Amino acid sequence: MMTDQKMEIRNLDFEIRAEQNEQHGNYITGRPIVYDARTDIGPWDEIIDRGALDNTDLKDVRFLINHNIDMIPLARSRNNNANSTMQMSVDEGGMEIRVDLDVENNADAKSLYSAVSRGDISGMSFMFSVDGESWEDVDTEHPTRHVTSIRRVLEVSAVTFPAYSQTSIQVRGLADALDSAKASLESERAKLREIERKKKKIRIMTEVL
């Protein structure tokens, strides 16, 4: 399931809801990706820009609990076709999903539906790789990273602790991604320093003349 792409994970406390009706059975809905929402990653703030999902690979996306790749997926979206047990829609606000849960035959699905209904689980998370980014306020101690394009969404999870990044898969997969983002930030800061150096050189030459 893991790829050679540098995958990142974002855990967010956006609402996830449990619903039930005679036509669709038991399902949960939620919005794992929200455009223009500022998230404190630690070394920087991060914003997923509007339109970042326009060209994203959503061909095969699983739905899990706490990114546990050792468990059977509770749902899956294949090319987002009508027969998929997870439906994904991208709109002006980001991404919304609808997950049909087989509560009769899958104990984990039944437990998740109950936990969401009770409010014990309220957050969603997604694993993704970045295709485009930009930075602002790179000369400050807490810059802002804009994710302008998401290359692929690999999976979406209902998460127990939406405000933290503590699962084992994050420890394995997030380190390289964070290192890459930090390298990108340092590159932007180096460019800024070079611009300032050239400006200073021009000022000195002007004063001499």
Predicted regions and their residues:
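Signature of dsDNA virion morphogenesis modules
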Residues: 1-183
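Enriched but not universal
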Residues: 189-209
